[in-house]
């Protein structure tokens, strides 16, 4: 049996309102639990449209047929009008999710984090994280114990900025296996659970066709040599491609794969995890930099 951590990112108002309820129903039908990470502040995701001037981002949008995939309400959110507050508008849905699934913070403002966190000060990072955690805790009525950086925009500064919040783990980067981030000699931070597998929008195109994606990703899960962690998005697998995701759950079960919340991947003694660090890097299919796992001994 292969255990795969299932991470569900919720980036937008529509993803929360429409995608999450469908995902909750789908997961319930198949007896699967996952980790949901919510954006709880303003939905300004439409402001990413200016990135269309970047060839790699434009190619990604064309390759994934973004207008059909996400819908124009997502692609234009926060452009011609102020972004609506996701948490306030969908508190009941988020609260229901937290009743049945591990629930953590994705971002206060997903667009702001993805666009500006790379040059924010530690204080600005801490203030933004605190704002999101405070809002999410007010909604779910219990402490937030985990987080996942929006767009995997994380580096050593983000690791340090999250330390005051006493989280059980973070999932801020791409990598191969769980690790303890090295803060300074002799001091380590909150365990990291990297995402190890590609997302739908990173691979769909000439190399992998939509109809063969499930076969392809299951093969990758079974071949994964580290600790497999897979990310889906409420805006994609919860709406347009919900039938495809349900088919994935069936095929994965038949292939001997069991999905679980990320927290279940943590060992009893996190001190046994190897040391590592998060550095800025790039991966195929994703525009811009993102946090990548690196061995602590690497220069």
Swiss-Prot record:
Tell me which residues make up the NodB homology domain: 2-260
Top-level taxon of origin: Bacteria
EC number(s) for this protein? 3.5.1.n3
Q: What class of enzyme is it?
A: hydrolase
Catalytic activity, as annotated: 4-deoxy-4-formamido-alpha-L-arabinopyranosyl di-trans,octa-cis-undecaprenyl phosphate + H2O = 4-amino-4-deoxy-alpha-L-arabinopyranosyl di-trans,octa-cis-undecaprenyl phosphate + formate
Q: Name one GO biological process term.
A: lipopolysaccharide biosynthetic process
Keyword list (alphabetical) reads: Antibiotic resistance, Hydrolase, Lipid A biosynthesis, Lipid biosynthesis, Lipid metabolism, Lipopolysaccharide biosynthesis
In what pathway does it function?
Glycolipid biosynthesis; 4-amino-4-deoxy-alpha-L-arabinose undecaprenyl phosphate biosynthesis; 4-amino-4-deoxy-alpha-L-arabinose undecaprenyl phosphate from UDP-4-deoxy-4-formamido-beta-L-arabinose and undecaprenyl phosphate: step 2/2; Bacterial outer membrane biogenesis; lipopolysaccharide biosynthesis
Query: What are the recorded GO MF terms, alphabetically?
Result: hydrolase activity, acting on carbon-nitrogen (but not peptide) bonds, in linear amides
**One cellular component GO annotation, for this chain's record?**
membrane
Q: Do the record's keywords include Zinc?
A: no
Q: Which family does it belong to?
A: Belongs to the polysaccharide deacetylase family. ArnD deformylase subfamily.
The protein's role, per its UniProt record: Catalyzes the deformylation of 4-deoxy-4-formamido-L-arabinose-phosphoundecaprenol to 4-amino-4-deoxy-L-arabinose-phosphoundecaprenol. The modified arabinose is attached to lipid A and is required for resistance to polymyxin and cationic antimicrobial peptides.
What name has this protein been given in UniProt? Probable 4-deoxy-4-formamido-L-arabinose-phosphoundecaprenol deformylase ArnD
Organism listed in the record: Salmonella agona (strain SL483)
Q: What is the lineage of its organism?
A: Bacteria, Pseudomonadati, Pseudomonadota, Gammaproteobacteria, Enterobacterales
